[in-house]
Amino acid sequence: MRINPTTSGSTVPTLEEKNLGRIAQIIGPVLDVVFPPGKMPNIYNALVVKGRDTVGQQINVTCEVQQLLGNNRVRAVAMSATDGLTRGMEVIDTGAALSVPVGGATLGRIFNVLGEPVDNLGPVDTRTTSPIHRSAPAFIQLDTKLSIFETGIKVVDLLAPYRRGGKIGLFGGAGVGKTVLIMELINNIAKAHGGVSVFGGVGERTREGNDLYMEMKESGVINEKNIAESKVALVYGQMNEPPGARMRVGLTALTMAEYFRDVNEQDVLLFIDNIFRFVQAGSEVSALLGRMPSAVGYQPTLSTEMGSLQERITSTKEGSITSIQAVYVPADDLTDPAPATTFAHLDATTVLSRGLSAKGIYPAVDPLDSTSTMLQPRIVGEEHYETAQRVKQTLQRYKELQDIIAILGLDELSEEDRLTVARARKIERFLSQPFFVAEVFTGSPGKYVGLAETIRGFQLILSGELDGLPEQAFYLVGNIDEATAKAMNLEGEKK
């Protein structure tokens, strides 16, 4: 971490002796720069190109050194559009890696990959900055305590609980509700835990980033009247950005989160939407740098790049970073190298199912595909573990019976199997829940359900006490008492 003497808006340190080079070649977002002999910049150094284009417009492009080519040439990847750059333009070597503002000044603000505010709310205090490239915490600094992180979402807390200071993946294809689930988690965690969150928007839609910002202002996660009391910092590198920005924006968000953990000694939430776009940007950069592609066209350094990001997301004795990462699954294929590499780093996986989404069950979390290393009796307790296992067994049996039902119909099943199907359908519907952030679309007020209430509800369904209630009563409700009240209302409407 660096303490800068000035509060100027630039995150690039001023240099007494400028090391100057010149652009020799431009290939889209990749620049080749020639430096004087003996003055080559290091890998990951930030280079700045300043000047004017042919129309007289001001140009200020920051690049990051990726390769030393020999013959005093380096190859760098631009963090913003290279429009207007020409061969022969002067390039300044800053002598250091990209540094971004960190600390309380970042809360309630939106930044780009360079740590520059993009929300038109004026400059940010940049006295405290930190380089985006650093090593992961040493083994001796790590904290090994195991504790559950309650989210207030029934299906998550019961069947695939999150670990405090762990890494969680949200897996799903296009349009099954990853971003909505992330927004709900930010909302619940800010309200229930009062914690600080950092959101890294990596290569997703600009509209979604805008919606998220507006949503946070509405729900009070970002406090417009007193910005310092906000609970979240946002870092965006959206779909329209060059691959260099999309590849590094995750590191910018992580650097801000690390400061809250290491210096402020806080428990932080880091949201990355979408980790697949980080891999995709790395693949684009790899091709532009001329590396031979590996399986399915991905970069040969896929595991290394993923590891360097993921290993920094961890709990230390000072504080913790709990990371929730949306993972787009190309063509719904979980064996694709991008999601498969991500799997190796995760403590819990929340898999979103298109089938459940088509049935209108939201959140569309697949209860049988979602997993967690925390679902063990010694961690969650015997009662929670038993309930979760019985819920899974009931749903698994229902899944096995679906083919028979499709061919022969429900009447051909044994009495016991019919009872299992009825309870499984109730469980399936009770796993749905109205979200605070979706109130606008659904018209139903959002619900936060504590873990004890969740376990009690599923125990009542499994015990058979609620067999007489219609399955529709369990759809989009909070706790089990709301389901029984809804059943009475439905009964009243029939009469």
Curated annotation (Swiss-Prot):
Gene Ontology biological process terms, A to Z: proton motive force-driven mitochondrial ATP synthesis
Topological relation to the membrane, as annotated: Peripheral membrane protein
NCBIfam families recorded: atpD
EC number(s) from the headed UniProt entry: 7.1.2.2
Listed HAMAP family: ATP_synth_beta_bact
Subcellular location, record wording: Plastid, Chloroplast thylakoid membrane
Protein name (Swiss-Prot/TrEMBL): ATP synthase subunit beta, chloroplastic
Organism ancestry: Eukaryota, Viridiplantae, Streptophyta, Embryophyta, Tracheophyta
Summary of the function given for this chain in its UniProt record: Produces ATP from ADP in the presence of a proton gradient across the membrane. The catalytic sites are hosted primarily by the beta subunits.
Species the sequence originates in: Scilla siberica
